[in-house]
């Protein structure tokens, strides 16, 4: 029996994090959403809870999102990690993939594209 999906949302805005959390809990029944507002919290929650899925905003208040992404990938080798940002460009997508992300979704494409990715990963 598979365990319920555990998501880690790394998002500095409490309003955005709350909206994402509600959206994920509605889209995936029995899921659990952990929320970190900065890189240090993200790393602590990741090591304490081993989430299966991570959504990380690349603009964080304490450290560069790419740096946290690299550390999350090292701590969570089996987890699926998606990076997100308002910034876009091939350079950014290539950078997050090199850092260990499984994908990138621009914030202006959320939640539709993100939902499609999570469904692929979960199924």
Language-model segments: residues:
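Alpha4 helix (beta4-alpha4-beta5 surface) of REC/receiver domains from two-component response regulators
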Residues: 67, 87-105, 109
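The feature encodes the CheY-like receiver
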Residues: 61
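Acidic catalytic/metal-coordinating carboxylates
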Residues: 38, 64-67
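Two-component/phosphorelay signaling modules centered on CheY-like receiver
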Residues: 14-34
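Conserved acidic carboxylate
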Residues: 11
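Acidic, metal-coordinating helix/loop segments flanking the phosphotransfer/catalytic sites
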Residues: 35-53
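Short amphipathic alpha-helix used as the core "switch/output" element in two-component signaling
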Residues: 66-77
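Hydrophobic/aromatic residues positioned on beta-strands within the core alpha/beta folds
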Residues: 83-84
């Amino acid at each position: 029996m598979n365990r319920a999906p555990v998501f880690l949302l790394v998002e500095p805005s409490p309003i955005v994090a709350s909206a994402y959390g509600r959206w994920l809990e509605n889209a995936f029944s029995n899921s659990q959403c952990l929320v970190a507002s900065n890189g240090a919290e993200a790393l602590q929650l990741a090591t304490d809870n081993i989430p299966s899925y991570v959504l990380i905003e690349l603009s964080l208040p304490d450290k560069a999102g790419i740096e946290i992404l690299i550390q999350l990938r090292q701590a969570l080798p089996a987890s699926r990690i998606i990076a997100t940002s308002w910034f876009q460009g091939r350079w950014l997508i290539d950078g997050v993939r090199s850092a260990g992300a499984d994908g990138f979704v621009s914030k202006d494409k959320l939640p539709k594209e993100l939902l499609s990715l999570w469904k692929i990963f979960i199924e």
